[in-house]
Amino acid sequence: MKSAEIREAFLRFFEEKGHTRVASSSLIPANDPTLLFTNAGMNQFKDCFLGLEKRAYTRATTSQKCVRAGGKHNDLENVGYTARHHTFFEMLGNFSFGDYFKRDAIHYAWEFLTGEKWLNLPKEKLWVTVYATDDEAYDIWTKEVGVPAERMVRIGDNKGAPYASDNFWAMGDTGPCGPCTEIFFDHGPEIWGGPPGSPEEDGDRYIEIWNNVFMQFNRTADGVMHPLPAPSVDTGMGLERVSAVLQHVHSNYEIDLFQNLLKASAEAIGCANDDAPSLKVVADHIRSCSFLIADGVLPSNEGRGYVLRRIIRRACRHGNKLGARGTFFHKIVAALVAEMGDAFPELKQQQAHIERVLKTEEEQFAKTLEQGLKILEQDLAELQGSVIPGNVVFKLYDTYGFPVDLTNDIARERELTIDEDGFEREMEAQRERARASSAFGMDYNSLVKVDGETRFLGYQGVSGAGQIVALFRDGQAVERLEEGEEGVVVLDQTPFYAESGGQVGDSGYLEAAGVRFDVRDTTKAGGAHLHHGVVARGNLSVGGAVKAEVDASVRQATALNHSATHLLHAALRQVLGDHVQQKGSLVDSQRLRFDFSHFEAIKAEQLKALEDIVNAEIRRNTEVETEETDIDTAKAKGAMALFGEKYGDQVRVLSMGGDFSVELCGGTHVSRTGDIGLFKITSEGGVAAGVRRIEAVTGAAALAYLNGAEEQLKEAASLVKGSRDNLLDKLGALLERNRSLEKELEQLKAKAASAAGDDLSAAAVEIKGAKVLAARLDGLDGKALLALVDQLKNKLGRAVILLGGELDGKVVLVAGVTQDLTGQLKAGELMKQAAAAVGGKGGGRPDMAQGGGTDAAKLDEALALAQRFVEQGL
């Protein structure tokens, strides 16, 4: 069976068992900043397992895209060199949220793996592990399924602590946890390795293909295991691993999907399609890079973008090792789309965007190599001894993406070595930081957990009555909040919009007889709306009735901006093209901010076109229509869904101007487009590679912005003694006059420097056959001093020159050494000493160097170093 057929068979099998097929979530975990990337099928259901979210189904099945590169789960350095390590993989999974448990989960797994209608694997090839004390699972396997005892293995606590076992899973130090049972496939005696639990278990003979986790306990901070009221099931089976089994190969790189990617990689690079690890690196990395970009990650120097940049550059480096010339990586995207585009339509939709990002990053990496070389040269100029420190090697690798092996090559050419141990210490420190940031980082038992959902009344108005169903103080449920206390109020129904979809939460107040709670913000936890604020008067108790009143002016101003965001999105696709995808937004009462995919700055005429289109829709004053429907019907109608956003079974479709703008949106909006009044773009710029940002204002804020601009024009006209009508002519004449004066000033400086050079040459002293000149010239910039040093070198012949001066409170230094002396004396070494004396740094070539500092009082001491430098060096 091909990989695509296995994926579909798995999902269809569990659909027949009453599971809801759920689309893969984004690689960027929703509402979970503690997790770097989605790395397991259960990530998108985490709140369901924690009891914080309830869905319309209790059984689910998915094929989840996962990335393991950076953080706790980091396979990057092994990729390409082993048979089964990948940065990207698919995890097939079936899940039960308080529905079925061990018996059904085990029988389902066995039926799918061995059933004639399904995978039809030979039963005698399958081994099973269970947690040492999980007699229930052991008995189901042996007495009901019929797995013989000789192929059953009990795994105890093999990681040095109670419940620390390959067969015991935990979400964190506290919270849901439980035993797991794993299914292994035996590749046969011709492959080295032993069964699970044996000393040879790390061999390739017995390969884990399926893991069933039984969440049946809640571990509290004291280590006590409490049975969960509704035990759940979380399973995972790696698609690539089971594909290798069914296709009778021993390496994931030999399965159909990778064979096609390896072929495309070899063609793009122009090398042989052989078993080279570097080729496997490229074929693997195109998957993780493409999917990360499709999900909104872009190369950067921090966080997720930094990991993406590392993966891209690793692929480029390995491509270069295979002989690639120029950019090649982006050319493989088409082959990936052909393989996986049907299962993951976001690849098809964003193919051009992915290719452009990869090509841009490849080109940037080529420039980065040049930059890294310059940085390395500066560090080598300051090097004392013959070993490049580990922190320098790490800085080049980590900050500039400079490959360690290249640093090593350069060091070897100069008879230097690198401090490999020091570099490894820096790398380990980075890994520790990543591991710390990748943990869930929360105590499950201190989370705000609310049963039920809050009914939202805000589409109908800004006020309503509700009953208090829960109160929280410092994350703990309480029965009462006293006057002056800060806390969270949960109502059975509310007109307050909870922050989501880029729109900020509502503010306002809750009121009852003698009681007032000022609401500063509103957020969501599962389906509940959390009103954050302070008790301004009286006290609140669970069960009490309150009147909820949203700040109407803030809500209305926010609605103007949110509706304008939808119009802007549609206008962008009209003006720039369908490649435009929303990458983020912020909507509050003051402004709107919209991030989107595009590869160049928007031209002035395009910005004007955007404003004209949006304002035309505003003037049309069409009704804003909403419709509640299911997600599939909404997409069939052309509604734009934001990839990675979590949508329920029922969605709200918002339409403006007929079919001008049709999007899925749960936010609050105007009734008619004319309510927006006016739309004005205030700024446009880049926020990351391939992502632009537009900020704008609407309504009264737009009028205020235009009035402010008008006042600035009047003030500018007054400053140049003109009017609004002739302001541009006046400014043009002023700038031309300024350029003329600057040119005259440069000419005067050059004459002064030349005259100074004539005078200075006479001040040079001779030391060991070389002329040495050190002089102070305040008021000259580095450019003028460089020209003067060049002039003096020609006048003096065999010479060492150090010039410095104070300019705008800072020290400027320039050093020069004539070519006949650079074998013994280096301008960079002299500059290093002189700049250090004035509290600064410097460097450059052996014949010319620049530097500076902040301590002008030490300038004369710095200049005096020139004579000693020559005396010691000759």
Curated annotation (Swiss-Prot):
Keywords: Aminoacyl-tRNA synthetase, ATP-binding, Cytoplasm, Ligase, Metal-binding, Nucleotide-binding, Protein biosynthesis, RNA-binding, tRNA-binding, Zinc. GO terms for biological process: alanyl-tRNA aminoacylation; negative regulation of DNA-templated transcription. Its main location: cytoplasm. It is found in: Cytoplasm. It is an enzyme of class 6 (ligase). Binds 1 zinc ion per subunit. The keyword Aminoacyl-tRNA synthetase applies. Its EC number is 6.1.1.7. It catalyses: tRNA(Ala) + L-alanine + ATP = L-alanyl-tRNA(Ala) + AMP + diphosphate. Pfam families: DHHA1, tRNA-synt_2c, tRNA_SAD. Zn(2+) binds at residues 562, 566, 665, 669. It comes from the Bacteria. Its cofactor is Zn(2+). One of its GO terms (molecular function) is ATP binding. One of its GO terms (cellular component) is cytosol. Belongs to the class-II aminoacyl-tRNA synthetase family. HAMAP family: Ala_tRNA_synth_B. Catalyzes the attachment of alanine to tRNA(Ala) in a two-step reaction: alanine is first activated by ATP to form Ala-AMP and then transferred to the acceptor end of tRNA(Ala). Also edits incorrectly charged Ser-tRNA(Ala) and Gly-tRNA(Ala) via its editing domain. PANTHER family: ALANINE--TRNA LIGASE, CYTOPLASMIC, ALANYL-TRNA SYNTHETASE. Consists of three domains; the N-terminal catalytic domain, the editing domain and the C-terminal C-Ala domain. The editing domain removes incorrectly charged amino acids, while the C-Ala domain, along with tRNA(Ala), serves as a bridge to cooperatively bring together the editing and aminoacylation centers thus stimulating deacylation of misacylated tRNAs. NCBIfam families: alaS. This is Alanine--tRNA ligase. It comes from Pseudomonas aeruginosa (strain ATCC 15692 / DSM 22644 / CIP 104116 / JCM 14847 / LMG 12228 / 1C / PRS 101 / PAO1).
